[in-house]
Amino acid sequence: MERGNRKSRIGVVVSNKMAKTVVVKVERRVADPKYGKIVKRAEKYKAHDENNACQIGDKVRIVETRPMSKDKRWRIAETLEKAEV
């Protein structure tokens, strides 16, 4: 069940060492304000992974959700691509 317009991001899992939590790195491209060159910026989000299904390197979609802990405000919506083993 979808609850209104929630933000979503696509990123890569960089850590899965915590219980039911993964760290997802989301890269975006922005233009430098002065010179206009396109540069990559990255942000890391802690996301809830109920089944501990994600592995490092998986490409996932995360969506906003209620606060689950001090840092965790996102959850895994779907796994888009599994990592090569």
Swiss-Prot record:
The record's Gene Ontology biological-process terms are: translation
| Keywords, comma-separated and alphabetical | Ribonucleoprotein, Ribosomal protein, RNA-binding, rRNA-binding
Pfam families for this protein: Ribosomal_S17
- Segment forming the signal sequence: none
- GO cellular component terms given for this protein: cytosolic small ribosomal subunit
Q: Quote the InterPro entries the UniProt record gives.
A: NA-bd_OB-fold, Ribosomal_uS17, Ribosomal_uS17_bact/chlr
UniProt-recorded Gene Ontology molecular function terms: rRNA binding; structural constituent of ribosome
Q: Does the keyword Ribosomal protein apply?
A: yes
What family classification does the UniProt entry report for this protein?
Answer: Belongs to the universal ribosomal protein uS17 family.
Q: How does it assemble?
A: Part of the 30S ribosomal subunit.
Q: What does this protein do?
A: One of the primary rRNA binding proteins, it binds specifically to the 5'-end of 16S ribosomal RNA.
Note the NCBIfam families from the entry: PRK05610.1 (NF004123), uS17_bact (TIGR03635)
Q: What is this protein called?
A: Small ribosomal subunit protein uS17
Q: Which organism is it from?
A: Anaeromyxobacter sp. (strain Fw109-5)
Its gene? rpsQ
